[in-house]
Structures are given as structure tokens and as C-alpha cells.
Regions:
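Exposed, interaction-prone extracellular/peripheral surfaces
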Residues: 166, 197-201, 207-427
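Extracellular/lumenal glycan-associated context and N-glycosylation machinery
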Residues: 1-52
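Short, structured coil/loop segments at alpha-helix boundaries
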Residues: 21, 25, 89-92, 156-158, ...
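An amphipathic, basic-hydrophobic helix/alpha-beta surface used to engage anionic
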Residues: 35-286, 326-329
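Acidic/proline-rich low-complexity IDRs
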Residues: 1-3, 129, 161, 421
Length: 427
């Protein structure tokens, strides 16, 4: 592109050439051609600038800082005036340095620029493209080059650690049994102990007896199985609030906490998010650390959209459910007429937990007042919870209003749910 100086040169040169033709003046012709030649020469003398970006890490937690390094090199044989602009996602904050730099690079020179950003909200983010604007030696042309180098960063939710969860393991004859590193019924050898009157003779270790003349009994590793399926409501209604504090964010963090706790107990955990065709994800049940990574990867990218209810998600999950799978629903329960009927269908075959983020409390804190509309919605929600409780569901309301759920309060509610009388609503 031409600068204002180049436009002036072009206009003056063209005008002088036209006037020279009309006046048959050779001197004006030469002067006009000289001005135009400046434009031609500066266009030919292009600068060769190279730039690239390096992101310190590709996976961080919410609130952590990310260091970005830009490397610029002038491969031309003359000095270069360069403007750099690194495009950033709107959700991140610049905390140190700048993603826009103005540089003067010597011939063959290179420089290194750094800036630091903070990502307060989970998600998959792209950095780039990197825009490089350079001017020629005469300041007549400038060119903008887009370096198509895209960097990807995943910001994972920061979730509280739970102390307990009211889900019990059960003995199973399925082939997916999980070793718990405890003595009990199983097939893998665990240890030996002294014989106690009443122990079956087939468990006596006769080789040890032959060597020590003492009766010792084999112990085997206990194997339990507990499938749990977490269903996270990601409908459009769950984004009511601020980008950092809303029902979906509270639900995502709670889902991550529950999944982490159950997987540490060597259980098998699956996940479904529901709301619309673009945010419905299924993670089949599985054990171990890799399963937690799979679940967190889905929770990172889920967005609030769509109006599909709990019944649709339950139908998608049926092919993964065993008769004793524990279902854990995390939903504000607002404007979902399918919850009650779906809960009635699974009342006799599955343990059902409902954790409901208090969306009305979030709206009240934003609005600064509790209106009659909020009162009616909260009353309607309490009636739904009581109806779910009548089917045997274990329900609890999770307070909102904070970016990170109150772990002490959640642990207190879970401790209360762990008491023998489970059929009640915890407000």
C-alpha cells in the first residue's frame, strides 16, 4: 500500500508528465519521471522480515499466566521499520508487556519480545495470526504480512477437591472389576497372614507351612466395581449471569471435582453434556488418570447453547448404563419439563443424585435485588426438587455467586448426604 508521501509523489509526477507533454518541456518531463522512479525503485527494494511465536505451555488452569515469546529477524541488507501485532482472544487479559510492538531493526538484526497473559475463563483458545507491517527505505510503501502461525492453548477449569461423596461400591462378577489394593474377594494375590480358626483350608499356603511349620493363609486383592455417569446441563439457560459466574461454570467445576474424586477411588466414570447438537458430548465410562483427562478435555470446551432437556441426554446414556450405575445430574433445573418424568423412569434401577447450582442467587447478586420473578422461579425449583426426592433421588442445592464453588460448604453438604437418611433435600 502507498503512504501519503507516495501518493503525493505519484500525483506530482503524473501532473508534471502531463504538463510536460502539453508544454513540450523536457525539464518538466525529466522531473516528473524522477518522482515516479522513486516509487518504482522503492517497490522493487522489498524488505525480508521473519517473525514467529512461541507459547510457553499449551495447558494451564484458570487464572494461571502464560508467557508468549515473539522472535523477529531482519534478513534484508538495510534497516527496517517494523510494526508487530499479535492477535489475542478477547477472553484473555494482558498482564505484562504488550502484544503490539514498534521496532527498528538493523540489517541482519534480530530481537526477542515477550509478553504475559492471564486466562480467567476455561476454554480452547487460539493465538494469532501474527501481523507484520513493514515500510520501505523511502517511506513510500508499506506492506502488511500475515504470518499464518496459529498457537493453541487449553485452559482447564480450576475445581475444588472433595473430601467424600455418598456413592458406595458393590461386589460384581463383571469382567471390568477394579482392584482396590485391599484384602477381600478376588483372584490376584495380595499378601499372607497367620491362620485364624475358621479360615478355609484351600487358602492355606502349604509351601510356607513346609518351610516354617506355621500355618499361613493367602489373602487376595479385593475387587469392586462402581460405574458412575455424570450428566452436565449446558442449555442456553445455564449461561445466565456473568461469563465467570453462572450455572454452567459452577456445574463444570463440580463435575470435574466429582469425576476426580470417584476416579481416585478406582471407579469407572462417564460424562455427558447436553443442550444442543453442538455441545452434546459423550465420554464412555472408564477408569484411571487418562479418563480424567478425557473428561476435563470435554468440560474445557463445552458452551451454553440449545434447549434439549435431560430426557435426551438420558436416552443417549442408556447404552452405557449397567443396572447399578449411579447417575449424577448437575443442572439448575430451570425450564426443563423432562426431568421429573425421566427421573421416574430410572427410580427403581439406578441411584440418582441431583446437584443444582442456585441460578437465582447468581441473578439476584447481579441485579442487586430479589424480585417476585426470582421468588416464583425459586419456589418452582424447590417443588421440582421435592418431586425428585419423592422418587428416591438425593438432591442438593449448590450456592452460586462465586467463580470457584465454596469447597467447605460443598463438602459439608456431601457429608450430610452421606448420613443414613438420604431421602431429603439439602437447601
Amino acid at each position: 500500500m502507498l503512504t501519503l508521501k507516495a501518493v503525493a509523489f505519484l500525483s506530482a509526477g503524473a501532473l508534471l508528465v502531463v504538463v510536460a507533454f502539453m508544454a513540450l518541456d523536457l525539464q518538466l518531463m525529466v522531473l516528473g519521471l524522477m518522482l515516479l522512479s522513486f516509487l518504482a525503485v522503492s517497490k522493487v527494494m522489498k524488505l525480508n522480515i521473519e517473525a514467529d511465536r512461541k507459547v510457553e505451555t499449551e495447558r494451564v488452569l484458570e487464572g494461571e499466566r502464560i508467557k508468549v515469546v515473539l522472535k523477529v529477524r531482519n534478513r534484508s541488507s538495510r534497516e527496517a521499520f517494523v510494526i508487530l501485532y499479535d492477535e489475542l482472544p478477547p477472553e484473555v487479559r494482558l498482564v505484562r508487556g504488550s502484544n503490539r510492538q514498534v521496532l527498528v531493526l538493523e540489517a541482519g538484526g534480530k530481537t526477542r519480545l515477550e509478553y504475559t497473559i492471564e486466562a480467567p475463563l476455561r476454554g480452547h483458545y487460539t493465538f494469532g495470526p501474527l501481523k507484520v507491517r513493514r515500510r520501505d527505505f523511502f517511506n513510500l510503501h508499506f506492506e502488511e504480512e500475515i504470518v499464518e502461525e496459529i498457537s493453541y492453548v487449553s485452559v482447564y477449569p480450576r475445581f475444588p477437591e472433595l473430601e467424600k461423596f455418598p456413592v458406595k461400591s458393590y461386589q460384581s462378577s463383571y469382567f471390568e472389576m477394579m482392584p482396590l489394593h485391599l484384602t477381600g474377594l478376588g483372584y490376584e494375590f495380595f499378601c499372607i497372614r497367620d491362620y485364624i480358626k475358621g479360615d478355609p483350608l484351600k487358602r492355606i499356603n502349604w509351601k510356607v507351612y513346609a518351610r516354617t511349620r506355621e500355618l499361613m493363609v493367602n489373602e487376595y486383592e479385593k475387587e469392586n466395581l462402581n460405574d458412575a455417569f455424570i450428566l452436565v446441563d449446558a442449555r442456553e439457560v445455564t449461561k445466565a449471569g456473568t461469563p465467570l459466574v453462572n450455572s454452567l461454570e459452577v456445574g463444570v467445576k463440580l463435575a470435574a471435582s466429582v469425576a476426580s474424586f470417584l476416579l481416585k477411588g478406582r471407579n469407572q466414570v462417564g460424562l455427558i453434556t447436553y443442550g444442543g447438537p453442538n455441545n452434546s458430548y459423550v465420554v464412555p465410562p472408564g477408569p484411571g488418570k487418562n479418563q480424567l483427562d478425557n473428561i476435563l478435555s470435554v468440560l474445557v470446551g463445552v458452551r451454553a447453547q440449545g434447549e434439549e432437556g435431560f430426557k435426551v441426554a438420558l436416552d443417549k446414556a442408556r447404552s452405557y448404563l449397567t443396572p447399578r450405575t449411579t447417575l449424577i445430574l448437575i443442572s439448575p433445573l430451570d425450564f426443563d419439563e423432562t426431568v421429573v418424568n425421566a427421573a421416574k423412569e430410572i427410580a427403581n434401577s439406578h441411584r440418582f443424585f441431583v446437584f443444582s447450582p442456585n441460578s437465582h442467587e447468581i441473578e439476584r447478586e447481579i441485579a442487586g435485588a430479589f424480585t417476585s420473578k426470582h421468588t416464583m422461579l425459586e419456589l418452582e425449583k424447590r417443588l421440582v426438587l421435592e418431586e425428585l426426592q419423592s422418587f428416591g433421588a438425593v438432591t442438593a442445592t449448590i450456592p452460586g455467586g462465586e467463580a470457584l464453588p465454596n469447597v467447605a460448604l460443598i463438602n459439608a453438604k456431601l457429608a450430610e448426604l452421606s448420613q443414613p437418611n438420604l431421602k431429603r433435600v439439602v437447601a
